[in-house]
């Protein structure tokens, strides 16, 4: 029994050491940062298996200036590239949005834009929600962004007052608490390209993309993504659609087009962007006269 306890203690310490090692690797990685007005773009290529014993490519938008910029949700009834939705709305930045039906194109989780309900959570999606796999809702007004813990009551979002809402899954962090993630789901445990949104305690909004399915970018499990969101200082964090949908777009000084490595074409380049149903945009606010 004493030997067994010692082994368990050793394994626990080893896991903790590895977690500390990953957090240090993340913080001390070769991050490149560029500030444009109130928007910051960060990117990092982790090589030689330096993060989670794997190669990773991560990109982050940080939005802290709500005087000049605002978050905006976009939707098209026919699948459209995130970059094209961004261009149509003259967005300066964008990532892909929430989940959708690949064949019939419609959102499979609640979506409201400019007060109009455009998508309802399907019965199939509703069955997935549990105490260990909570849904979350990104709520957007002109001056504020919130991440809400979705109630299990069907179509709960429809009664909320926010003009723009996008439900996604799962909720990773809420009010500073790392939420449990259902361990028997491949979607949780397997590594994929990931897209997520987070909010820090000071109101800074983060849009995060993790590339995957390539030797230089392994992708992350949701538990790994959850750790990354915590290391980025998120008080609240929500996973969005990922895989081949994952896209990071820019139209700012010296940075134009898709900057990550979408995987739908099977190559590690910028040309594999998938058409999607919806997206999260960053737009410039109209100047007040």
What are the residue ranges of the model-derived segments?
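Sec/Tat signal peptide C-region and signal peptidase I cleavage site
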Residues: 15-19
């Amino acid at each position: 029994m004493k030997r067994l306890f010692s082994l368990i203690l050793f394994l626990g310490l080893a896991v903790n050491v590895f977690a500390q090692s990953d957090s240090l690797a993340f913080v001390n990685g070769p991050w490149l940062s560029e500030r444009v007005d109130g928007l910051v773009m960060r990117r990092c290529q982790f090589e030689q298996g330096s993060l989670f014993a794997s190669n990773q490519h991560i990109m982050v938008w940080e939005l802290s200036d709500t005087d000049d910029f605002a978050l905006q949700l976009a939707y098209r009834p026919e699948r459209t590239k995130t970059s094209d939705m961004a261009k149509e709305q003259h967005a300066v930045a964008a990532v892909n949005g929430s989940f959708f039906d690949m064949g019939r194109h419609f959102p499979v989780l609640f979506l409201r834009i400019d007060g109009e309900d455009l998508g309802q959570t399907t019965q199939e999606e509703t069955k997935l929600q549990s105490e260990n796999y909570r849904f979350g809702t990104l709520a957007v007004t002109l001056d504020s962004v919130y991440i809400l813990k979705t109630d299990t009551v069907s179509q709960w979002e429809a009664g909320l007052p926010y003009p723009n809402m996008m439900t996604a899954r799962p909720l990773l962090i809420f009010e500073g608490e790392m939420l449990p993630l259902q361990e028997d789901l491949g979607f949780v445990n397997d590594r994929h390209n990931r897209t997520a949104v987070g909010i820090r305690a000071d109101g800074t909004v983060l849009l995060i993309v993790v590339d995957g399915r390539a030797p230089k970018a392994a992708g992350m499990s949701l538990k790994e993504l959850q750790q990354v969101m915590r290391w980025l200082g998120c008080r609240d964090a929500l996973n969005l659609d990922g895989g081949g949908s994952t896209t990071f777009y820019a139209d700012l000084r010296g940075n134009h087009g898709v900057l990550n490595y979408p995987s739908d074409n099977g190559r590690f380049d910028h040309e594999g962007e998938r058409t999607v149903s919806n997206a999260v945009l960053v737009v410039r606010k109209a100047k007040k006269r």
